[in-house]
């Protein structure tokens, strides 16, 4: 499921925005395992969003007091996948546990129904799906966006609509006939009972008032 979309060039500020928004949307709950690629900004953004602020006590001595800082919370398990490339081709892949322990990573992977190793395959697959659904992002094409406003709008549309309108075969469940029935990410998360049409998704109020 796509939890957060922040269009634009990847920068440290955008990484912070993504992590903060994911924390907000999940109510601050720590995931069993967080994995990213080796982009350095994540190592500061993740404890910055989930961590506890520590204010150093005053010493009574002259000089500027030490600034408050964040520490990673207990239970945070975060690992990265680092790829080495030569001439644009991946020649080696290494993994590294940044927060938590190897045992905690192994325990999280042991509870997963789909992953047995630290990886970013879900994100990479989502990137491919995004390019397939949004022609503006296709490589080597004349359909690229000429106006950022339209590019941003279509990015939000296709990525968030994916949650409700895109049936995912691998997350399906067997029906009464024993056939696997594809589910949308929203169905798998218990947020919908059927695969929505684009018309349903576009006409559903963003906020429901009781």
Language model regions located:
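Residue-level recognition of single "structural anchor" positions
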Residues: 1-210
């Amino acid at each position: 499921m796509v939890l957060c979309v922040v269009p634009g060039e990847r920068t440290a500020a955008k990484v912070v925005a993504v992590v903060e928004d994911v924390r907000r949307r999940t109510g601050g709950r720590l995931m069993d395992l967080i994995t990213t690629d080796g982009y350095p900004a994540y190592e500061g953004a993740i404890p910055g969003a989930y961590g506890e602020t520590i204010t150093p006590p005053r010493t009574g001595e002259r000089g500027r007091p030490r600034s408050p800082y964040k520490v990673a919370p207990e239970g945070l398990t975060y690992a990265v996948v680092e790829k080495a490339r030569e001439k644009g081709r991946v020649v080696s892949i290494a993994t590294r546990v940044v927060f938590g322990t190897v045992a905690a990573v192994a325990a999280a992977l042991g509870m997963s129904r789909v992953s047995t190793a630290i990886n970013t395959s879900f994100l990479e697959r989502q990137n491919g799906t995004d390019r397939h659904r949004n022609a503006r992002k296709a490589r080597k094409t004349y359909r690229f966006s000429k106006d950022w406003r339209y590019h941003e709008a279509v990015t939000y549309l296709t990525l968030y609509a994916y949650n409700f309108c895109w049936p995912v075969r691998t997350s399906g469940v067997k029906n009464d006939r024993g056939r696997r029935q594809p589910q949308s990410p929203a169905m798998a998360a218990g947020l919908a009972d059927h695969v929505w049409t684009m018309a349903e998704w576009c006409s559903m109020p963003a906020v429901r008032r009781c």
